[in-house]
Amino acid sequence: MSNVRSDKPFVLAGRTFESRLLVGTGKYIDMEQTRLAIEASGAEIVTVAVRRTNLGQNPGEPNLLDVLPPDRYTILPNTAGCFDATEAVRTCRLSRELLDGRNLVKLEVLADQKTLFPNVIETLKAAEILVKDGFDVMVYTSDDPIIARQLAEIGCIAIMPLAGLIGSGLGICNPYNLQIILEETKVPVLVDAGVGTASDATIAMELGCEAVLMNSAIAHAQQPVMMAEAMKHAVIAGRLAYLAGRMPRKLYASASSPLDGLIK
């Protein structure tokens, strides 16, 4: 029984969350669909792109916070659309002003428009500045275990390696690197990007990830609200399967019922 896993709460920046599904707000047809899908997902943490979303910086325009009130959801501002450390740091500081001094941010610094791979050099620079500036940094990164370790050593509170390209729906492309990151990293690891359907989310959780973040997999589904509910259950199922521990893989069959004592 020494290998039995015990459940631990999902804690970020000193706060405990029940849901291990984090969701984005982009790509929906309107704010009402956004609201309905996020409600169906059961998510408590909702990430928003500060440079693309009105959080109050544009008076007179629809404000996402009217649909997703901060007293109900933890708003996680992100730096989507930033391609260097300077832009990312500036965006995080703007988000802190807009959200009444809240320090929780999702850092992402992209390398190019085509792949949206993270620029890990600029990400490391930005992370170091933001941590020193008092931010609680959750960081989007590659599935390189060494970079993940360096980001954790800088002081990031969560490492968020991609499972596949952003918006690709390719699923968990490199589970082996994710396993190394999970073994070597002492802070929460969340899969970010690449999830396409419920089974992808379950696999990420079965590997041992603390949580999964997604947007396109829900927003681009034929029925986003229904997919949001599917993802809610997929994450729960994956977490339970991880805690339960899967059976060993075997090359040959093993009968469910013993052959001894068969009726003759």
From Swiss-Prot:
GO terms for cellular component: cytoplasm. Keywords: Cytoplasm, Schiff base, Thiamine biosynthesis, Transferase. Homotetramer. Forms heterodimers with either ThiH or ThiS. One of its GO terms (molecular function) is thiazole synthase activity. The keyword Cytoplasm applies. SUPFAM superfamilies: ThiG-like. Pfam families: ThiG (PF05690). Pathway: Cofactor biosynthesis; thiamine diphosphate biosynthesis. It catalyses: [ThiS sulfur-carrier protein]-C-terminal-Gly-aminoethanethioate + 2-iminoacetate + 1-deoxy-D-xylulose 5-phosphate = [ThiS sulfur-carrier protein]-C-terminal Gly-Gly + 2-[(2R,5Z)-2-carboxy-4-methylthiazol-5(2H)-ylidene]ethyl phosphate + 2 H2O + H(+). PANTHER family: THIAZOLE SYNTHASE. Its EC number is 2.8.1.10. Belongs to the ThiG family. It is an enzyme of class 2 (transferase). This is Thiazole synthase. CDD domains: ThiG. It is found in: Cytoplasm. 1-deoxy-D-xylulose 5-phosphate binds at residues 167, 193-194, 215-216. Catalyzes the rearrangement of 1-deoxy-D-xylulose 5-phosphate (DXP) to produce the thiazole phosphate moiety of thiamine. Sulfur is provided by the thiocarboxylate moiety of the carrier protein ThiS. In vitro, sulfur can be provided by H(2)S. GO terms for biological process: thiamine diphosphate biosynthetic process. The active site is at residue 106. InterPro entries: Aldolase_TIM, Thiazole_synthase_ThiG, ThiG.
